[in-house]
Amino acid sequence: MKTAVIYWSGTGNTEAMAKAVAEGAGAECFAVSEFSGNVEDYDAIALGCPAMGAEVIEEDEMEPFVAEVEGFASGKTIGLFGSYGWGDGQWMRDWEDRMKAAGAEVACGEGIITQETPDDDALVKCKELGKTLAAV
């Protein structure tokens, strides 16, 4: 199956997670600013973004992209992942709810989050997410 891994990263933490997801999926990995394909052409999509500000996704590049994905998310399997520095992961719960409301199935039932730099356990979970998406 054709899988895309698309992310925004400010410090490199979410980028490391994205690379692990892509490795697990055997998929290409794109920073959202560099992605020029059509996400509708993919069977599964992994989206990564850290928590920003008051636990929201990055607003200048990732938010508009996610809004675009919502338009055709129905019936798609979408994996979500990201890092955070504070809070309790509310941004990810909100993101999961948003994708489900758009009709998507959230891979693995929930997004993968890690505080700050992803440790080995978080990277293993990211690779497993990639494998799940590749099997869609």
Regions found by a protein language model. Give the residues of each.
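FMN-binding flavodoxin-like domain, especially the glycine-rich phosphate-binding loop
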Residues: 3-4, 9-30, 34-37, 41-136
